[in-house]
Design a protein with these regions (language model features):
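Second-shell loop/turn segments in exported
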Residues: 10-21, 35-39, 48, 116, ...
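Basic/polar, cationic surfaces and motifs that engage anionic cell-wall
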Residues: 183-220
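Sec/Tat-exported extracytoplasmic proteins
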Residues: 35-39, 53-57, 64, 85, ...
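Acidic helix/loop microenvironments that form the catalytic cleft of cell-wall polysaccharide enzymes
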Residues: 53-56, 177-195, 249
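Peptidoglycan-targeting cell-wall enzymes and recognition modules
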Residues: 2-26, 54-165
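Short acidic, glycine/serine/threonine-rich helix-capping segments at coil-helix boundaries
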Residues: 221-249
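Alpha-helical scaffolds flanking conserved acidic
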Residues: 4, 42-51, 178-185
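Proteins synthesized as precursors that undergo proteolytic processing into mature forms
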Residues: 158-162, 169-176
Length: 249
C-alpha cells in the first residue's frame, strides 16, 4: 500500500507537522502501508486517528505500558489489589513485572498471578492492547499467535495494526465521518478524559490534512429510538448510567 490509496493527498510534510518526533518519516511510511488496509483513508478519518492515538500514546512515544509504580501509588491507584486486599505494596515498589502479574491476574482470559500472563499481555501499542483475550482476538485477525502479537504491537506497523483493529472493531470510522470528536473519545476512553487535548490535536490535524471541521449540532427536540446515535444519545446514556455511553442506541 502507498499514499495513493488514501482518498486525499497525504503528503510527507503533513506527517512531519503532526508527529513531532525524529522518526516521523518512519511513522508516515508505516501509516501509508497500514491505515488504508482498515479504510482509515480520508482526511477526516486520519485526522481523528492521529489525534486520538497521539493523545493515548503521548505523541506516538509510548508503545508499552508503564507500570513502574511506587508503593504509595499502588495503594492509591490500585487499592483493590493492594490496600484492600491486605497485600503489602512495599513488596511491589517499582517492580513492573510483579505489579502486572497482580493487577491483571485472572481476568481478560489471563491466568493467575503465577502464570506470568499479566506481564506477558500487559498494555502494548498506541491504544494499549491488554490481556490475553484481546491479544488473542487481534492475533486471530492477523494470522499469528498471541505471543507473536505481543512483540508485534510494540513495532510501528504493529502498533498501527492493533490500533486499527480496535478502530474497526468499535466502528470508529462513523464517528470520523460525522466529525464527532466526543463520540469517538467516549468509544475509546469510556468517558471524556483528555477531551480538550484530543480536540486541540484533532482541529490541528484537520487543518493540516485539509479537512473542514463543523461542530455536530445537537437537536434536543429529537425523539430517541432504536438506531438513534449522536451526542444527545450519549448524554442520555450518561444520565441513565449506561456504560459505555457511546452515543449509539
Amino acid at each position: 500500500m502507498a499514499k495513493e490509496h488514501f482518498k486525499f493527498n497525504f503528503e510527507e510534510w503533513m506527517a512531519e507537522e503532526l508527529i513531532h518526533r525524529e522518526d516521523w518519516k518512519d511513522w508516515y511510511e508505516a501509516m501509508c502501508e497500514i491505515l488504508p488496509l482498515w479504510e482509515v483513508n480520508t482526511a477526516e478519518r486520519v485526522a481523528m486517528f492521529v489525534a486520538q492515538c497521539g493523545h493515548e500514546s503521548g505523541g506516538f512515544r509510548v508503545l508499552s505500558e508503564n507500570l513502574n509504580y511506587s508503593a504509595k501509588a499502588l495503594n492509591t491507584i490500585f487499592p483493590k489489589y493492594f490496600r484492600r486486599a491486605n497485600r503489602d505494596a512495599n513488596e511491589y515498589h517499582r517492580q513492573p513485572e510483579k505489579i502486572a502479574n497482580v493487577i491483571y491476574a485472572s481476568r481478560m482470559d489471563n491466568g493467575d498471578t503465577d502464570s506470568g500472563d499479566g506481564w506477558r499481555f500487559r498494555g502494548g501499542g498506541i491504544l494499549q492492547l491488554t490481556g490475553r483475550y484481546n491479544y488473542t482476538k487481534f492475533a486471530e485477525e492477523m494470522d499469528m499467535t498471541p505471543e507473536v502479537a505481543v512483540d508485534y504491537v510494540r513495532t510501528k506497523k504493529g502498533a498501527l495494526d492493533s490500533a486499527c483493529w480496535f478502530w474497526d472493531s468499535n466502528g470508529l470510522n462513523k464517528y470520523c465521518d460525522a466529525m464527532d470528536i466526543v463520540g469517538a473519545t467516549k468509544r475509546i476512553n469510556g468517558g471524556t478524559i483528555g477531551l480538550d487535548d484530543r480536540k486541540k490535536h484533532y482541529l490541528h490535524a484537520m487543518d493540516v490534512l485539509g479537512g473542514d471541521f463543523e461542530e455536530p449540532e445537537v437537536d434536543y427536540n429529537q425523539t430517541i429510538r432504536q438506531g438513534s446515535r449522536g451526542p444527545l444519545v450519549a448524554e442520555v446514556q450518561e444520565k441513565l448510567d449506561i456504560s459505555p455511553a457511546d452515543g449509539i442506541f
